[in-house]
Amino acid sequence: MPIDISADALRAAARGLAREFPRLRVVPVIGDFSRPIDIPVRRGLPSVVYFPGSTIGNLTPEEAHAFLSMSRGVAARMLVGVDLKKDPAVLHAAYNDAAGVTAAFNLNLLARINRELGADFDPRRFRHYAFYNPAAGRIEMHLVALEAHSVRLGRHRFAFAEGETIHTENSYKYSPGEFTGLAAQAGFRGTRVWTDRRGLFALFGLTA
């Protein structure tokens, strides 16, 4: 039962799953995973919430706790992907990649604001910058103004000083012990952890 807020992406994913697993019944549900969703669960059958990738890191710890607690009400088991804490140099290289993939992703926010909200951002006047904040345990993504200028958004105008940043995104990292503790606070008792050989990423199996 795949869930996504984008109907087009959801339908494409559901079609792909159906092709790859023809014996699997795929029931797509359009919704925001951060809010309660009415999911048709068949009684008597075990349910597992699968939250792959490292999306949970885009939530604050408080939001992650709320999401885990909400999911526990849907299923007694979860599989959750978590990006682990690691050498800050590795994190810096990943979020400031030489190919510029992350920079393009971050700068695309300005294009979307222009298109969807009618602003007049010039992406050429900003550069991408990301760094690890050890006190908060997170990567912070920013867009840095390359020069002093102003931007119009609706009836408002916002002035940027050279070097001023727009804080666009956070990506929280956890140690295995930290995430196990967070899951326990959300009501999950049993925890299994699988990691890659380098200990960069983990899959947590949670049982309520």
Regions found by a protein language model. Give the residues of each.
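Class I SAM-dependent methyltransferase SAM/SAH-binding core
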Residues: 1-35
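Substrate-binding/catalytic lobe of Class I Rossmann-like enzymes that use SAM or dcSAM, i.e.
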Residues: 92-176, 180-186
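Conserved beta-strand signature within the Rossmann-like core of class I S-adenosyl-L-methionine
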Residues: 73-88
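A conserved beta-strand element that flanks and buttresses the S-adenosyl-L-methionine
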Residues: 50-51
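Core SAM-dependent methyltransferase catalytic element
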Residues: 143-145, 196-208
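Short amphipathic alpha-helix with an adjacent loop that forms part of the alpha/beta core around
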Residues: 36-44
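A short linear hydrophobic-aromatic micro-motif
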Residues: 189-193
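A short, conserved alpha-helix within the catalytic core of class I
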Residues: 57-75
